[in-house]
């Protein structure tokens, strides 16, 4: 699998993808799979690369540790970038009549008390999950909050004056080494705690909350989950118009990503790099060799477009102002970013 290359012709792109993925599918059924999985998407092929050497479906990540049939993989699907998409969720609804483990009232419905007694009732109860891929999380206003909850407008009649209901799509369980905070709001990242411990805490909370666990998962189970997800790197590996994104001198794809240096403060534009290294505004050099289109004429326009996008990201000036914790802390009304 390591040397597999996908090439696209304008007329044969769909057929090539079908054949390519069919081959992958026949090799991906054992308990301990190879270290690469490929999935077609609307613009080409995405790849999941496992730095640990393989996707072991015997891992606790795939086991239901709670009481409602859910596992981590219920909301973190390999073929959907290790999150979920409305399209994938809708397909699961139709196949299961809305009884797949992702469809649980505790947080999949617009309200935990929503009617799920019939297929149509479930379709209505899970409409935000079906149409937007959103999970409901209700949390109280934290002590010392810098805001007040003064009004509630809830079309589902499910929020009270002390809790805030938030609908969020599950974050990808991939590329986790690059996180500076865990969860949308960073609540799993208290000051001074390591990323590993943050992910352990997040996994435990997911089991007890989303999976409605009756028993707190063991340290061994949590370590198993975190070790697995920490080894996953996911990225687009081939484009239907530009071809392979990680060959012939360019460096896209998840394997290259797995080799990327990273630490908190790396290449910091405000001078906070712990090594003291100066900021380099040329953040990305993945596709420099495509500035001229490369050596494949049929793909040159798309490749040059990708290279231009990289240049824009690196060089287009963006004035940053009015950001609490940044402009005020530094005493700079405007900070130029790119």
Describe each model-derived feature in a short phrase:
Residues 28-338:
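Periplasmic c-type cytochrome electron-transfer domains
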Residues 1-13:
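Bacterial N-terminal signal peptides that target proteins for export
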């Amino acid at each position: 699998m390591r040397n597999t290359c996908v090439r696209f012709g304008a007329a044969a792109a769909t057929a090539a993808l079908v054949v390519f993925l069919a081959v992958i599918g026949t090799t991906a059924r054992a308990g301990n799979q190879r270290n690469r999985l490929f999935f077609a998407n609307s613009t080409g092929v995405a790849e999941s690369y496992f730095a640990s050497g393989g996707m072991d479906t015997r891992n606790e990540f795939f086991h239901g540790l709670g009481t409602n049939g859910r596992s981590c993989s219920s909301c973190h699907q390999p073929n959907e970038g290790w999150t979920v998409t409305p399209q994938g969720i809708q397909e699961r609804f139709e196949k299961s009549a809305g009884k797949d483990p992702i469809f649980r009232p505790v947080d999949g419905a617009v309200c935990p008390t929503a009617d799920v007694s019939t297929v149509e009732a479930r379709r209505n109860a899970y409409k935000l999950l079906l149409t937007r891929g959103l999970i409901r999380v209700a949390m109280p206003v934290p002590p010392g909050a810098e805001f007040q909850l003064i009004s509630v407008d809830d079309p589902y009649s499910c929020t009270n004056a002390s809790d805030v209901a938030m609908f969020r799509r599950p974050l990808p369980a991939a590329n986790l080494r690059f996180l500076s905070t865990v969860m949308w709001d960073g609540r799993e990242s208290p000051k001074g705690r390591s990323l590993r411990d943050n992910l352990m805490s997040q996994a435990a909370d997911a089991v007890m909350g989303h999976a409605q666990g009756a028993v707190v998962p063991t340290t061994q189970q949590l370590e198993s989950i975190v070790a697995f997800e920490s080894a996953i790197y996911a990225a687009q590996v081939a484009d239907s118009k530009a071809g392979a994104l990680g060959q012939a001198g360019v460096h896209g794809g998840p394997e290259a990503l797995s080799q990327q240096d990273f630490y908190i403060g790396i290449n910091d534009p405000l001078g906070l790099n712990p090594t003291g290294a100066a900021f380099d505004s040329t953040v990305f050099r993945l596709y420099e060799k495509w500035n001229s289109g490369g050596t494949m004429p049929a793909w040159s326009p798309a490749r040059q477009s990708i290279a231009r996008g990289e240049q824009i990201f690196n060089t287009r000036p963006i004035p940053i102002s009015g950001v609490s914790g940044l402009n005020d802390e530094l005493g700079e009304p405007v900070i130029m970013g790119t």
